[in-house]
Regions:
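C-terminal substrate-binding subdomain of Rossmann-fold SDR/epimerase-dehydratase oxidoreductases
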Residues: 24-167
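Flexible, glycine-rich beta-alpha linker
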Residues: 1-16, 38
Length: 167
């Protein structure tokens, strides 16, 4: 199981980052439903590394490593903090808080990482701020700098692989 995943290229409906990007690129106000809800926000490449570490551990020791594993960020942060970071990185945008009782979500979603940290020795490389910055940069480079999505994605993969000592 993973925390809330962030990264460029997600255009899903009713999701915080995609909704923010849509509002930023159309100069509309971002509607924020639950500003004080907290989540762990994990860059899209992080759990992939975690899955590879787990697969390597499972090889030959399936019984020991065949249970549930959580891959999450090193900290949790509120929705409003994510919104403010996204606006800071995009540079010009605005938001409005609108209470919506029809859309029911859990207030705090936090994964317990102790087992993963102890037995897999896995931790996220990027902190939440860096994850959000890279995510917003992906969209900014595509929307404002006219870069190809594949080019920005490949740059981010290369950078991550170097940091993770995977290359």
């Amino acid at each position: 199981r993973t925390a809330n995943i962030v990264g460029g290229g997600d255009w899903s409906y009713k999701r915080l980052i995609p909704d923010a990007i849509k509002s930023f690129t159309t100069n509309k106000t971002l509607i924020v439903r639950n500003p004080n809800f907290t989540r762990q926000w994990l860059f899209v490449l992080e759990p992939l590394k975690g899955y590879l570490v787990l697969a390597k551990k499972q090889y030959g020791k399936l019984n020991k490593f065949s249970s549930n594993w959580n891959f999450g960020a090193n900290s949790e942060i509120s929705v409003i903090e994510i919104v403010k970071l996204a606006i800071k990185f995009w540079e010009k945008s605005k938001y409005k808080i609108v209470k919506n009782k029809k859309f029911i979500e859990q207030k705090n979603i936090l994964l317990n990482m102790s087992k993963t940290n102890k037995y897999l020795k896995w931790r996220a490389i990027y902190n939440t701020k860096k994850s959000i910055r890279l995510t917003i940069k992906w969209y900014f480079d595509v929307a404002k700098n006219n870069k190809k999505p594949s080019e920005v994605t490949n740059e981010q993969i290369e950078s991550y692989m170097k940091l993770a000592n995977l290359k």
